Amino acid sequence: LIKDNGNIEIRAEIRTQFGSIIKVVEVSTNSEKVSLIYNFPKWDKVFGSVRLGVMTLLNQFSHKNTKILCSNGGRDNEIFNFSGEFNHTKPPSTLVSSSRGLGATTGKIQIRNNGKSVNLQWDPSESAVMPMLHNESFNNRTLSRVIFSMREMDDTLKKPVNIEAFNFSISTF
């Protein structure tokens, strides 16, 4: 579908046992930007974790000089080395689905490597997501990912919760 602004929109319905997920990908024809939208129409309340928007980084962003920049509540961005092995998505126990992630309180993450950057952006007032990182090496290659968590669970979760829509953009500026 070509939108009025000239952008290209691709829409798909993904049927799951919990209900349909409507995924929309919009590619800008004016800038280096792709937007993704996830909607969960008619979903019942969910008791568990929900992770989506998995971004797998190319190997050129998996080197030791890759940096992650985001704000974790302060005025300025914090800078993290995206090196070594770690997996924020790994549950620490059977009662807790995750023990770590990024605050990214401004709804922005920048991934930098050798003068190149990828920017992820969302509106935290619309979607309270927690970005998680995964970096793992095997056979002289590295798997590097950013994953968004909409829900995590622990032993204090008593009631199921609604799943809201989530949208974010990927850009190079």
Predicted regions located by residue number:
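Short edge-strand/loop segments of extracellular domains
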Residues: 55-65
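Segments adjacent to and within acyl-thioester-processing domains across lipid
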Residues: 75-91
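Short intrinsically disordered coil segments
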Residues: 53-55, 71
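Beta-strand-rich recognition/accessory modules
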Residues: 1-24, 28-52, 89-173
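Acidic/polar low-complexity flexible segments
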Residues: 63-71, 79
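Short, solvent-exposed aromatic-acidic interface loops
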Residues: 41-43, 73-76
